[in-house]
Amino acid sequence: MFGMIKNSLLGGVENNEGKLVSKGEKDGVAFEEREYEGGKFISTEVSGKPFDEASKEGVLRLLKYVGGSNNKSAGMGMTSPVIINSYPSENDTLQPNVKVLLRIPSQYQADPPVPTDNTIQIEDRESVTLYSTQFGGYAKEADYVSHAAKLRSCLGPDISYHSDYYMCCGYDPPMKPYGRRNEVWFIKNN
């Protein structure tokens, strides 16, 4: 297992940066509108646990898959960001269920290995346009909730996006202590 996780964390990282559409800043908060192409993703759902615990569990499942826990025993390397679909509660926390997603590396998009863990699904996802804001550090639930509120305030009432969920994104392996990149994404309504 360590070998699988080591490969997924220390192998090459394929970054999915998206295409910048526009940038803005309001009240000291920078935000961007970006477009991301569709493709194949792996996903897993974890429920009944606090956000931080559920996120870690889901991420570990996906790391095992890209590290070789699949029908081809293929160590695929890592992609970023890790995306966590989160569902806000009325009390400024996140519900105890998450969906963790990771884009399958480009060389495996046409024929991805089948997961050996039946809690992992392969999904075809459509292209999306989204609004994002970035922050550093080791992100926890409170950080994502705070930055989601800031992004919501920046966008105001006239910009339309999905409000029933948002995406919490991390770009860095856990052993990177400085210069960490985290983002909150709101998916634009078409």
From Swiss-Prot:
The keyword Secreted does not apply. Keywords: Cytoplasm. It comes from the Eukaryota. It holds the Pfam family SOUL. GO terms for molecular function: heme binding. The keyword Cytoplasm applies. InterPro entries: Reg_factor_effector_dom_sf, SOUL_haem-bd. One of its GO terms (cellular component) is cytoplasm. It is found in: Cytoplasm. PANTHER family: HEME-BINDING PROTEIN 1, HEME-BINDING PROTEIN-RELATED. Belongs to the HEBP family. May bind free porphyrinogens that may be present in the cell and thus facilitate removal of these potentially toxic compound. Binds with a high affinity to one molecule of heme or porphyrins. It binds metalloporphyrins, free porphyrins and N-methylprotoporphyrin with similar affinities. Monomer. Forms a distorted beta-barrel structure, with two helices that are packed against the outer surface of the barrel. Porphyrins are expected to bind to a hydrophobic patch on the outer surface of the beta-barrel structure. This is Heme-binding protein 1. It comes from Xenopus laevis.
